[in-house]
Amino acid sequence: MKVAVTGRPGVGKTTLCLKVHESLKDKMTVGGFITKEVRRDGVRVGFKLVDLSSGNEEWLARVGEGKARVGKYAVNVEGLEEFLDSVRTDADLVIIDEVGPMELKSRKFVRFVENLMGRERLLFTIHLKSRHRLLDRIRREFKVYVIDESNRNRIAEEITRILEG
């Protein structure tokens, strides 16, 4: 089953991915990555990618100047592309958090995700409003859940059951 989760920023998409990972990691191999916020003194200063298999981290974006930008963030396209080389994709379940505007600055990331699309078990988080041919394809081919504070725990349990079966 291919599942995508979307919702507004901060609603719990990454937390949902971590819950699914925690529930399934002893029952099957799980690869992929999550994206975590980095805060300093309570202020978000960027995002780091975290490999679910190795724990390796790489900056995805930071506040500052750079060629590839999304809002106030400079996207570390080169770092993202190097990070992808070590992400485990031969697992029973691959989690990609997130397919969004920052990641889509990289053609290599787009190809990386396209190469996963034929897999049987996938869990992606997708940006709520972004338009891109890859996001359109995911919306067509995946079961898409829109989460909020009232349904995120129930949906995490439902997705775990679906992906386990």
Swiss-Prot record:
Has nucleotide phosphatase activity towards ATP, GTP, CTP, TTP and UTP. May hydrolyze nucleoside diphosphates with lower efficiency. This is Nucleoside-triphosphatase THEP1. Belongs to the THEP1 NTPase family. Keywords: ATP-binding, Hydrolase, Nucleotide-binding. SMART domains: AAA (SM00382). It is an enzyme of class 3 (hydrolase). ATP binds at residues 7-14, 93-100. One of its GO terms (molecular function) is ATP hydrolysis activity. It comes from the Archaea. It catalyses: a ribonucleoside 5'-triphosphate + H2O = a ribonucleoside 5'-diphosphate + phosphate + H(+).
